[in-house]
């Protein structure tokens, strides 16, 4: 089976073109693929298919609201094999892949996800890199909570961007303190507020100046710390705006993997950032057949 390796601000993925759902992406298969010692290594897997094929293949039980059977469907799996509703960095890489291999000839089209339709605009692209804007949909705030990250307690906003987030703005946190924080360690959070788990973002307060700029690190549900999280940057941008008494505006978010720009409006939110497709290859049938025996 062919694959492409790509990343969006160093949030990396194995892209599998499997339009007709010929492979079973079992938990074991995804875990093995994403393992950085015995597999290709990635934060997640992006299967390329369509809504119609996903319905026929049993990947989707029902059609997500607002999409058509002909729309591309991003079947996204976390590194632990769990199914995720949405991944903003993944959508950029997914859209770039479609354009680069000729499966899509438009610069503006819809990528469907379990969280619903995500319209994308490819601002520029080459076989290697792309600049992509994703309409991430409305940001929904549904409360406040706390998390313990790296032994430190943080307060934040509970935010839905198609998946759950706790975005914690710390007014006294310096960029150096953020840099050395142990974000990779298991986090503690309110399981009643987040019964299905949560992505936790820790960020500095917005800097003064014409551009609201923050620094962020993230512990992703089902993965651990990643170099970037697209939906997490949107949640962080919204929390940063709320911190300065706003609900709309633009925020530049710096993550360990690079920088993205988030715009929050009254109706939606937009994530603009890079994508890179760095390698193509083929996974042998023998490897697929031996997944269960991999040590």
From Swiss-Prot:
Catalyzes the stereoinversion of LL-2,6-diaminopimelate (L,L-DAP) to meso-diaminopimelate (meso-DAP), a precursor of L-lysine and an essential component of the bacterial peptidoglycan. SUPFAM superfamilies: Diaminopimelate epimerase-like. Belongs to the diaminopimelate epimerase family. GO terms for cellular component: cytosol. Homodimer. Keywords: Amino-acid biosynthesis, Cytoplasm, Isomerase, Lysine biosynthesis. Substrate binds at residues 11, 78, 88-89, 163, 199, 220-221, 230-231. NCBIfam families: DapF (TIGR00652). It comes from the Bacteria. It is found in: Cytoplasm. Pathway: Amino-acid biosynthesis; L-lysine biosynthesis via DAP pathway; DL-2,6-diaminopimelate from LL-2,6-diaminopimelate: step 1/1. The gene is dapF. PROSITE patterns: DAP_EPIMERASE. PANTHER family: DIAMINOPIMELATE EPIMERASE (PTHR31689:SF0), DIAMINOPIMELATE EPIMERASE, CHLOROPLASTIC (PTHR31689). InterPro entries: DAP_epimerase_AS (IPR018510), DAP_epimerase_DapF (IPR001653). Its EC number is 5.1.1.7. Pfam families: DAP_epimerase. This is Diaminopimelate epimerase. It comes from Mycobacteroides abscessus (strain ATCC 19977 / DSM 44196 / CCUG 20993 / CIP 104536 / JCM 13569 / NCTC 13031 / TMC 1543 / L948). The keyword Amino-acid biosynthesis applies. The keyword Isomerase applies.
């Amino acid at each position: 089976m062919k694959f492409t390796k790509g990343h969006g601000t160093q949030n990396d993925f194995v892209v599998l073109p499997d339009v007709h759902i010929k492979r079973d992406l079992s938990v074991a298969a995804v875990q093995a693929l994403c393992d950085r010692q015995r597999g290709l290594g990635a934060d997640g897997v992006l299967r390329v298919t369509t809504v119609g094929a996903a319905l026929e293949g049993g990947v989707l039980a029902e059609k997500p609201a607002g999409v058509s059977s002909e729309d591309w469907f991003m079947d996204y799996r976390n590194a632990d094999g769990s199914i995720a509703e949405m991944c903003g960095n993944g959508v950029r890489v997914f859209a770039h892949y479609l354009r680069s291999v000729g499966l899509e000839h438009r610069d503006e089209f819809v990528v469907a996800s379990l969280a619903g339709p995500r319209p994308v605009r490819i601002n520029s692209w080459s076989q290697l890199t792309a600049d992509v804007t994703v309409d991430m949909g409305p940001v929904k705030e549904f409360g406040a909570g706390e998390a313990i990250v790296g032994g430190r307690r943080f307060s934040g906003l509970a935010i839905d961007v198609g998946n759950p987030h706790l975005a914690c703005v710390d007014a006294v946190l310096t960029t150096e303190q953020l840099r050395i924080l142990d974000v990779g360690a298991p986090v503690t959070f309110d399981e009643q507020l987040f019964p299905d788990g949560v992505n936790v973002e820790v960020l500095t307060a917005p800097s003064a100046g014409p551009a609201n700029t923050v620094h962020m690190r993230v512990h992703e549900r089902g993965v651990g710390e990643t170099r970037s999280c697209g939906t997490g940057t949107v949640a962080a941008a919204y929390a940063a705006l709320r911190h300065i008494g706003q609900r709309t505006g633009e925020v530049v978010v710096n993550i360990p993997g690079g920088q993205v720009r988030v715009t929050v409006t009254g109706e939606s939110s937009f994530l603009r950032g890079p994508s890179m497709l760095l390698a193509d290859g083929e996974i042998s049938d023998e490897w697929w057949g031996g997944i269960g025996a991999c040590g």
